[in-house]
Regions:
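Rossmann-fold NAD(P)-dependent oxidoreductase module
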Residues: 16, 20, 99, 148
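NAD(P)H-binding glycine-rich loop region in Rossmannoid oxidoreductase-like domains
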Residues: 36, 42-92
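Short-chain dehydrogenase/reductase
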Residues: 83-90, 125-127, 131-146, 168, ...
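Conserved Rossmann-fold NAD(P)-dependent oxidoreductase catalytic core, especially the SDR/UDP-sugar
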Residues: 94-136
């Protein structure tokens, strides 16, 4: 069985990804804090995102772990929300790293959500992997998130950083709000 574990998979990206993977013969396992009422199609395991627990067994013999966890950035940037945006990403990433060290047959690849805004918003510069990071909340969070990945990554597991920007789709993401 080609099991793929999606941490933080109850949002727009996670559910779209689960459907895509399922259509291609993979078995998505969604890990999240709260099970959506309409989530009946995929296996769901509850976690608190900061402590290893019963969910760790899902990583055993999985093909991949995909970490999409984190408080939505679509909120008013109060000090409390900014802190939650940072901590929800960094703590969950560290937690996954701890859990991967507990299983006998961990996934071969860890796909880690990040942000294209790690470089800031340079208006005329084409950014590459060697570009300087920017300043502000998004670059700060992006750097901390990726550093947590690098510090938590067990040897032998390939890492992929998925640096997204605005996510849009017919039924979710930023497009729904932009249509209003």
């Amino acid at each position: 069985m080609n099991k793929v574990v999606i941490a933080g998979g109850t949002g727009f990206i996670g559910m779209s990804l689960a459907q895509h993977l399922s259509e291609r013969g993979f078995h998505p396992v969604i890990i999240g804090r709260n099970k959506p009422k309409d989530l009946t199609k995929y296996e769901f395991i509850q976690w608190d995102a900061v402590n290893p627990g019963d969910w760790v067994h899902a990583l055993e013999n999985a093909h991949a772990i995909i970490n999409l966890t984190g408080k939505t950035v679509d909120c008013i940037k109060t000090p409390e929300n900014c802190d939650l945006i940072l901590r929800s990403r960094v703590e969950s990433t560290r937690n996954i790293g701890k859990a991967l060290k507990e299983v006998s047959n961990p996934p071969k690849v860890w796909v880690q959500m990040s942000t294209a805004h790690i470089f800031g918003d340079p208006p005329t510069i084409l950014c590459t992997e060697s570009s300087s990071t920017g300043y502000g909340l998004a670059p700060f969070v992006g750097k901390a998130w990726e550093e947590a990945l690098l510090q938590s990554l067990p040897s032998g597991i390939r890492e992929v950083r998925l640096r997204t920007s605005f996510v849009m789709g017919k039924n979710g993401g930023a497009l729904v709000k932009l249509k209003r």
